[in-house]
């Protein structure tokens, strides 16, 4: 340490306190990084890695970025999973003797990005925390950029994981008692999550909720936010308590399979329900829309209230179009207010805020001309005329980005500032006159008077004009020599420079002080501005619903008291938009208390999956309070939607297609109620034909007998179509197709009854498989049909009315029968191998403690998979 310079000693001391961060260490106009930080940053940022003290025996790796463009570099690092500690100079080096004091003023983390370019305008940037006291769990989350703060509680980890996927945080804060297994599950739920520990026990004020655990979760979150941000965060709102059961529940797989906010193939917004429905005009409205898609309502009263407003906007096209024009002039009030409180707002931000609030009276007057009984928001809109006057009288219309370079305030706003500006202006007029005079006096027409921050004002003469020029004759004193010019000063110029720069410096310093005062004045309006932002964002969403309803010919849904679902000429809204509207084939669907299962057959590519998805998406849109793509729509209010669509291995957790399929089916069969919707697409295809067929039939029977959930079940197991004889609640439907001269023509029309052919070879032909393969497949198919008949006899299996009790005696019998094929020695060795170490003894204990009488077959399969993974 004795060989290290004082500046590097200071760096190492600060770095030791922030070892989990990349330290941006301010040196003049640059943020410098050293040692391993420099190696990491240079690699990620693709900037040059250099060396400090390069001539010494052990030079220090270093790299740097300009402070004025640091935000983009910080964003890149944070997006790559790094935390960045910003260490600033706390003193002016010009006025400090010795070492400049430096401190970390902020830590930028994935969940606390505040810079304008660092977060997507249409996405929330959530940071989340949770605490556990089994069986209770409390969860709190916050968007630091907007001030939103919410908390909830529940009693199971499944709801925890579902909430995390719904919120989709960029950062999770946990305490030390969270198990490694749960951490792994959280990391598998979303790719963007990072798990971080709280760093302080300091308590910050928060309105304590009645629930102690929720209070702890909120405190854990706020503690971490204050530790990293190290500044006033008064824009963070009072915590709002909510309950997950107040919204339709959809897990990660349901949202992914239905492509609500992200497409499966492209991982983008395009081609999703969010993409279709986003006709919002403000960033706040776009974020609100995504929240509404993630959390459809289950309160009929709240849904109808939204629909009434959509009705009103739909009936007033001209007013809606005018409203869209007004909204288009409204900037992101939520995040502007956040930056005001945070202290990183600039004058241009405040001009945007001024323009935004100037539209509130226009919006209020427009809504007053419509049905005020429906548009209850009109009474909550508050024209902020006093704040508007403050901003209008103070700032120029086009201020610079920096608040420390002057040029922010209007003439007449502050008398002292006007005097400084006048002195500076007069001085510059004098400089122009001096330049003209010196050109005439010296005869050098290219002579010019210039300025830079190092040398101040100077007279510059090109080298070509210096041959017969004697500077001393004109009172010129040499200041700097360049390759093509000389720079001079005079006593007169130096004297005037002090006056001009003194006035400019004083003006800039005063302007910054005035701006800070203005910022603090605007901060007083934080709560009122946030309330206006909330109202405007909701109005923006509802006008967007009306816009797409008019554009795509949607209709208002109604909700049945008897839990009937009846859709007349329904369409898939996203597929319809991608296609030509006139080419889309609409379909009907009716499910009620007597017939609540559709068994759907038909060829591949005929539209079975699209049909099932559109029923689910229409239900979601309706419970958001939006019109739906139907001629008529009567719906129940669903509490949950479960889906199993598509075939995909879960490579991260090592689960096969079939295992993923069974896990998703298990959730639906375990948690579905008569108020739920289940979408099962070709269950059982990941295993052998008879296993898959047996499981599919068992699941259909289970739904029919147990949950009575509305269910759409597509299948290629045509043997299942005879189930309608035993299950009155099941109805066979099919997606029609015709074969004409060996070619398959998809009609995409859902009709009553079953089909007994999947047209697999015809679909393969459409995919341009080699003709030799097609011909051989036809021969093999003919042989199968001739020898076995088209249908397997499994469809005639009698339904099991009462399952036999599974007990230890039956289990032992099964084991004894199995060992008939093994020698006793082999069996004993196998048993010894299974339980030969401590880990496997634990597995033995788990098996012994299983309550087999109360386990369903799928639960047993899931448990077996867990045990298998422990043995790997």
UniProtKB/Swiss-Prot annotation:
Keywords: ATP-binding, DNA damage, DNA repair, DNA-binding, Nucleotide-binding. It comes from the Bacteria. GO terms for biological process: mismatch repair. Changing residue 706 to P: In strain: BB399V12. SMART domains: MUTSac, MUTSd. SUPFAM superfamilies: DNA repair protein MutS, domain I, DNA repair protein MutS, domain II, DNA repair protein MutS, domain III, P-loop containing nucleoside triphosphate hydrolases. ATP binds at residues 602-609. InterPro entries: DNA_mismatch_repair_MutS, DNA_mismatch_repair_MutS-lik_N, DNA_mismatch_repair_MutS/MSH, DNA_mismatch_repair_MutS_C, DNA_mismatch_repair_MutS_clamp, DNA_mismatch_repair_MutS_core, DNA_mismatch_repair_MutS_N, DNA_mismatch_repair_MutS_sf. One of its GO terms (molecular function) is mismatched DNA binding. GO terms for cellular component: cytosol. Belongs to the DNA mismatch repair MutS family. This protein is involved in the repair of mismatches in DNA. It is possible that it carries out the mismatch recognition step. This protein has a weak ATPase activity. HAMAP family: MutS. This is DNA mismatch repair protein MutS. It comes from Staphylococcus aureus. The gene is mutS.
